[in-house]
């Protein structure tokens, strides 16, 4: 993984864990992660802190896009851990806006894994989250190019 690539730049902690973005837009951010030991607790299941990291990262990216590529900051995260996901399983994640205002946005984030059998509803919910974000913050000079890098990544998905 090239640390200078635009895709790596958008969220280094998630990329280090192996998270792959599937969609980035103002109305939906999604991706997936194969669970390795890096993201599991000693009991070989997904660490709750990793679930929280995914939730805040996806909501922040979506809110940043929805705000016109302005800087955003998470001000509240509420997460419910519903079921475990084990080492080796693939966890899917999606985030979508609940409320998009000029200064405050609220995003819902869901993590799930696939059932082992084919059924009409093939999802086992792992966690659900709500993330509240403050939007429109100034972008510091040393990262002024961050919005352009994010736009490059979006154009490649």
From Swiss-Prot:
Q: How does it assemble?
A: Homotetramers.
Q: Which pathway? A: Cofactor biosynthesis; phylloquinone biosynthesis; Quinol/quinone metabolism; 1,4-dihydroxy-2-naphthoate biosynthesis; 1,4-dihydroxy-2-naphthoate from chorismate: step 7/7
For this protein, the parts annotated as crossing the membrane are: none
Keywords associated with the record: Hydrolase, Peroxisome
Q: What is this protein's name?
A: 1,4-dihydroxy-2-naphthoyl-CoA thioesterase 2
Give the record's GO biological process terms: phylloquinone biosynthetic process; protein homotetramerization
State the InterPro entries in the record. HotDog_dom_sf, PAAI_dom, Thioestr_dom
Q: Which SUPFAM superfamilies match?
A: Thioesterase/thiol ester dehydrase-isomerase
If you read the UniProt record, what top EC class would you report for this enzyme, in one word? hydrolase
Q: What else is known?
A: May originate from a horizontal gene transfer with a bacterial species of the Lactobacillales order.
Q: Name one GO cellular component term.
A: peroxisome
Keyword Ribosomal protein listed: no
Annotated EC? 3.1.2.-
| Localization per record | Peroxisome
Q: Which organism is it from?
A: Arabidopsis thaliana
Single GO MF annotation: hydrolase activity
Grouped into one coarse class, the protein's main location is other
Fetch the CDD domains from UniProt. PaaI_thioesterase
């Amino acid at each position: 993984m090239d640390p200078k690539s635009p895709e790596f730049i958008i969220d280094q902690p998630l990329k280090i864990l192996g998270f792959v973005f599937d969609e980035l837009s103002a109305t939906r951010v999604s991706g997936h992660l194969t669970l390795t030991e890096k993201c599991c607790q000693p009991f070989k299941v997904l660490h709750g802190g990793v679930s929280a990291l995914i939730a805040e990262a996806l909501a922040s990216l979506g809110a940043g896009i929805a705000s016109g590529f302005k800087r955003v900051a998470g001000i509240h995260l509420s997460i419910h851990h519903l079921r475990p996901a084990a080492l080796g399983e693939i966890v899917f994640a999606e985030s979508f806006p609940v409320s998009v205002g000029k200064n405050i946005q609220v995003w819902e984030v869901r993590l799930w894994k696939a059932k082992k059998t084919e059924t009409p509803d093939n999802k086992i919910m792992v966690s659900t989250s709500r993330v509240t974000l403050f939007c429109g913050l100034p972008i510091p000079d040393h990262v002024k190019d961050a919005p352009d890098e994010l736009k490059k990544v979006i154009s490649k998905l």
